[in-house]
Design a protein with these regions (language model features):
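Motif-centric detector for short Cys/His coordination patterns
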Residues: 1-74
Length: 74
């Protein structure tokens, strides 16, 4: 079964608590991924907090997202 994000909750800074479809829960630090043009706006913590679940992963209004497998392995 491929991992899929079912819940996500902002913790602080660039940390998001993520729950996956197999019940696994993790607090993930997204800061290491905030490089390159698509992720640059996410360096603003106000913008970073605008994430949403776009099944099967977490995404932002500008189209940025990170593969759910990458999140699961983090």
């Amino acid at each position: 079964m491929l991992p899929s994000v079912t819940k996500a909750k902002y913790v602080r800074d660039y940390l998001i608590e993520v729950k996956f479809n197999d019940g696994t829960k993790k607090v993930i630090d997204f800061e290491p991924w905030l490089t390159g043009p698509i992720f640059r706006p996410l360096k603003s913590k106000v913008y970073f907090r605008k994430f949403f679940i776009d099944s099967p992963t977490i995404a932002w209004p500008n189209g940025a997202d990170i593969a759910p497998e990458t999140l699961y392995e983090a």
